[in-house]
Amino acid sequence: MNSSVSTHGTGDCPVNCTKSEDFAPSKLGTKEYWDGAYKRELQTYKDIGDVGEIWFGEESMHRVIRWMEAQNISENAAILDIGTGNGMFLVELARHGFSNLTGIDYSKAALELTTNILVEEGLKNINIQVEDFLNPSTELKGFDVCIDKGTFDAISLNPEDREEAKKHYVTSLRAVMRPNGFFIITSCNWTKEQLLEIFKPGFELVRELPTPNFQFGGVTGNSVTALVFKQTD
């Protein structure tokens, strides 16, 4: 069975996109929702080999990897995919020669899907583990590059206490990264200015990665924001 990429929703944000501080909490911010979603995707993969959605489309992976290659990030750099989902970003990183890869997710169903895909792709040396990033294990540390493509968006929809969840996320991020490490985030719920404010403690902006523009009512904007931060302390 050859893995195939889903043709549905690959360019869309999967987590209730709206660039506003006032977006409402949602079931999309719950573990139960993602467990159910990945159980369905796992069954679909077993049935027809469809890996499921590539969050924000395949270009969202390529723009991050282009930046990493332009910065001469070592192929041996320790890279963490936060909320790896189906693991396709890990697959793409491996295809580009990166060899020290870790993917985490709090959904066991997601990691079962990831495991199936990695086996099919013949990738044996990628580390995947169940982790709640808001309360990570002490062993999760020492990463040169951390990548988030939609996970912070989902966490921001937590119906219980999203403000605390955001703070815990930043704390966890600082704990797992090496000094001067890079954090690359792709978001459709937060603007550049909002992300700068959220990650101001301990991070500085290195680069805004180009994303597709849209025009509506004579106004030009971006539906997706992609930023590279560097840890400063």
Swiss-Prot record:
The answer to whether the entry has keyword ATP-binding is: no
What GO molecular function annotations does the UniProt record carry, in alphabetical order? Answer: methyltransferase activity; protein-lysine N-methyltransferase activity
The UniProt keyword set, sorted, is:
Cytoplasm, Methyltransferase, Nucleus, S-adenosyl-L-methionine, Transferase
Q: What name does UniProt use for this protein?
A: EEF1A lysine methyltransferase 2
Q: Name one GO cellular component term.
A: cytoplasm
Q: What's this chain's function?
A: Protein-lysine methyltransferase that selectively catalyzes the trimethylation of EEF1A at 'Lys-318'.
Q: Which family does it belong to?
A: Belongs to the class I-like SAM-binding methyltransferase superfamily. EFM4 family.
The reply to whether Lyase figures as a keyword in the UniProt entry is: no
The protein's Enzyme Commission number? 2.1.1.-
The coiled-coil regions, if any, are: none
Origin species, per record, is Danio rerio (Zebrafish)
At the highest ranks, the source species' classification is: Eukaryota, Metazoa, Chordata, Craniata, Vertebrata
Return the broad EC class: transferase
One of the Pfam families matching this protein, by short name: Methyltransf_31
Q: Which InterPro entries match?
A: Efm4/METTL10, Methyltranfer_dom, SAM-dependent_MTases_sf
Its main localization is cytoplasm
PANTHER family the UniProt entry points to: EEF1A LYSINE METHYLTRANSFERASE 2, PROTEIN-LYSINE N-METHYLTRANSFERASE METTL10
Q: Where in the cell is it found?
A: Cytoplasm; Nucleus
* Catalytic activity as recorded in UniProt: L-lysyl-[protein] + 3 S-adenosyl-L-methionine = N(6),N(6),N(6)-trimethyl-L-lysyl-[protein] + 3 S-adenosyl-L-homocysteine + 3 H(+)
Q: Where are the transmembrane segments?
A: none
Mind listing the GO biological process terms from this record? peptidyl-lysine methylation
